[in-house]
Structure formats: C-alpha cells, structure tokens
Amino acid sequence: MERVYYRYIFRLKSPLALGSGISDNTDSDVLLDSRGVPYIPATSIAGVIRHSVDEDTARELFGTIQNGSGEMSKVLTYDAVCTGENAVSVRDSVRLNNKVADDTGKFDFEAVETGAEFRGYIELADCGADGDSVINEAFQKINAGLLRFGHKTTRGYGTVAVEGLQRIGFSDADDWLDFDMFDDECWKNAQAVELTKPSDLTGITLSLKQRGGISIRRYSTDVSDGENAAPDYEQLSLRSGVPVIPGTSWAGAFRARFCEFAGEEKADGLFGHIEENVKQARNKKSAIYFSESMLDGGYYKTVTRNSIDRFTSGTNDGALYTEKTYYGGSTELELLFTEKQSDDVKRAVLAVIADLDNGFLSVGGLTSVGRGLFSVEKLCINGQDMTESFRNYDFDKLLEVW
C-alpha cells in the first residue's frame, strides 16, 4: 500500500466569486458552509486538477464511469476552508456594448475579498510517481494563475497563491493509521514542496501610472454627517479601502479597441464569445486572462459638481452629485495567454497597449472628461524588460521574446 498526503494554503490574489446557487443577498451569493465560512468545495479543486492533465491520465487517476460501472478515483480531494478573517463583499456589474448598458444587463454578486486564506488537503491512494507529478504540475499552474477557481476566471477572479505546500507519504499500514492529517503535530516531518513557474507560461506585465482620476463606480447609500457631503458614488475598492480596477473593466476596454484593429472574428478568437439563442452554439472561452489591479501611492479626492444643460449652459435641476475618486496612483496589469497567437494578433494587442500609453484608450466611466487614463511605465514580456523597445514601437523586437 502507498498513501501520500498534501497540505496547502491558497491565499487569494484576487477576489473569489464562487456561487452557491442562492440569491438571497445578491444575484449570486458566495458559497458558505454551515458556520457561514466561505470554502472552495473539493469538487471544484478536483475538477481544476483533472482539467490540467491529459485524458488518459485523468481516467487512470480520477476514475471513470462507463455503462453503469466504473473505477473510484485514486485522488481524494477535501474542501479548502477559509481560515482566519475573511471579508465577503458585493460587486456591482453591468453588461456594456460600446459603453452603453444592455437592457437587463445589471447584476451583482458576492465575492470573497483578496487576501483570504484557504487550507486544504489532498490524498493519493496508490498513485505512484504519476500522482506526485500531476499534483506538482497542477499546483504550479494554479500558483502561476493559469488555473483558477470560481467564475469570471479569465477576468481577474479566482487567482490564488499556493503557500506552505507540504507532502508526507506512508508505505506502512500502522504508520498510516496513526496519521491524522488535521493534526498539525503529524506534519512536523513533512517535506516542503517548492514550486517553479511553468515553462510554457506566456505573459505581459504592465506597470501603469495614473494620469488623472479613475471612476469605476460603487454606489453609496451613506448619509451626510452634516459637515462633509457623503458621496453618491465612489471608486470601487476592497473592504480595506484599497482601490481596484477589476479585470472585467480591463477586458472590456481592450476587447473594444482590439476589435477596431483586428476585426470581430479575431476578437472572438482571443477574447472568447457566446452564441445566444443558438441550439448548437459554438462558444469559446477567452484565451487571454486579465488580472485585477490594485492602486497604491495615490490619494482619494471628493469632487462635487453639477450637470450642465448643453443648450442653456445652466445647471440641470436635481443634478448636483458628489463623487469620491482616486488620483495619482500606480498599479500593475498582468495579461496571460493560454494559447499560441499569430503575429497579427500579437501586434494588435501591442497596439492596444500603445493606445493605452498614449491616452487614446481609457478605462472605466467618465472617460469623456479625462478619467481612466494611464501611462505605461514599464512593459515586461515573459519576464524580460522590453520597455525601451516598446517606447520605440519596435514591435518586431517585442515579438522575438513573445
């Protein structure tokens, strides 16, 4: 007999939107256990790991069901339960088409905020070296952001960092029976597992600097204290107050501009698409992953202004509103590519980034009055600093390392 156990911690690098199917608080409430604690179900973890291997290996390790009979999985996965403090926040979203909201496109959902930690366990039963290889490869991809949890995974949600990965194995039945994987004392002699980056990882990292304010709105119901006006809406932020730009905002802006450069067909191939009202729809998942960006180094500013009638140049009745926005911050945006792309597609992506740097592409709302502008301070492709080539618009040089 052979039993191998892995213990790990998933620390959220971006919000986790894992729906429970319940819509008591929002359109999609986060999954909670009986104590009200968020967790990642074992089925989700097993599904993500299984998806990372080829079909033959999947059948060998994860079991099969055929014609009413089958084999049990050799990989036993346990729920990863949130430890310590956690914060569940509500995200408001709206489906846009060329900056215009679609009818019935407003929705909200709950998400576990960035920084929460989840502890989980995996047991391998007589898997041999193949089992260790599969777990190591899967956790490398999870740690690199190629495998994520929940929904909206290509748009910045469900990214985790793998921390404290440990392995312990048993070939003696008595030693195995004495082992309790939930007891910290039993892991004292466990082996620490180091993870490396996948060799096939293709990514672009942008270091960005704000050129003005940002307006990705979260509407507020706070009441004024009599001295300071409570904002009608404010920049989207974490519970800790850190302002964020969700991957959905980046993806929408990038896709719209990419479509202008490369056309709808290539945009569907890179950003994915869904065929609605079609019986045999050929839907495609996005081949580009956007990160969620956290802003820092700037400051909040509360602005009160009027809406002006374009004909009379006078103020509109009831159109005084207050906004809390964020200025002068810096952030990073990471783009990961899961498929090889043609040079035409790569050039179009680089052209979109150039537009962002030159102020021709903005993110969020109120873009017509100067919000959402950024400059590219640094550009790295696959870990190599290519800022100078980008400044010279030497796309041929950039493609050499992509």
Regions found by a protein language model. Give the residues of each.
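Small/polar/charged residue-enriched interaction surfaces, especially the RNA/DNA-contacting tracks
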Residues: 1-402
